[in-house]
Amino acid sequence: YYIEKDKSTYKPEDNDSELLWKFQTEPNEQIILKIGLSSVSAEEAEANLKKECSNQSFEQIRTNARIAWENLLGQIQVETSDEDLKTSFYTRLYHACQTPFTINDYSGSYKGSDGKVYKSQQLPYYHGWSIWDTYRTKYPLLSIVCPTEYKHMISSLAELYKQGKPRSATKAEPFLTTRTEHSIITILDALQKGMFDGSLDELLPLMLKEAEDISNDSPDKALERGYDFWGVSELAGKMGNKELKKEFSLRSKEY
């Protein structure tokens, strides 16, 4: 992280896991802190802050954020006389759109789930995953609400496989993330919609391993395993691999 402050008298206490900031204020005094973040280094965090908002006031940043959210959420118009229902809908849409989010620095650098530093040459890199169960409705919703960004999300998800994607968060995660089961189904859905144009040649073997790793020792896991096997079958068919398609189509019914 990197912090710009409006007064030099604020002295933070920093250790490996937390930042403690103590300060004295007069009545009605405002404190302005600008914080830049990076998954790579403090130097990258400083560059991000200076590039994005160093010359903007708090009010400018808040106004720009409000406009950006209104433009995104306003794509869906709700017709109802019940204002509570309308508020409920837009609140949930707002929550759904908060993740995943871009984590690459302005230089293109980002840290992967394996702890290594990568460089995104063209596309923004997304992180902050929670796919288990939300793959059913949230991600199809994002494909409608923000299709351009969604393509980048799916490309980032494909890159996650190349970093050795586990089902749960690793100790080296660059930002908050949780479960990523059923990424197979998420990528298949994007492919069916023409929203993923990456190569499956490298991905499919990694997906096979992930699907095989789901145990078959309870009814719910058997169903989840079967769904991923069906996804593998469909992806194999897209690649023209008829034998693999047939094999995993049969295995998808093991439940």
What label would you give each PLM region?
Residues 1-126, 159, 166-167:
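Acidic/polar, glycine-enriched structural segments that form the non-catalytic walls/loops
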Residues 78, 123-127, 232-243:
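General secondary-structure propensity
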Residues 91, 95-98, 186, 251-255:
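Alpha-helical scaffold segments in carbohydrate-active enzymes
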Residues 127-236, 249:
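Aromatic-rich carbohydrate-recognition surfaces in CAZymes
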Residues 227, 239-255:
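Catalytic cores of carbohydrate-active enzymes
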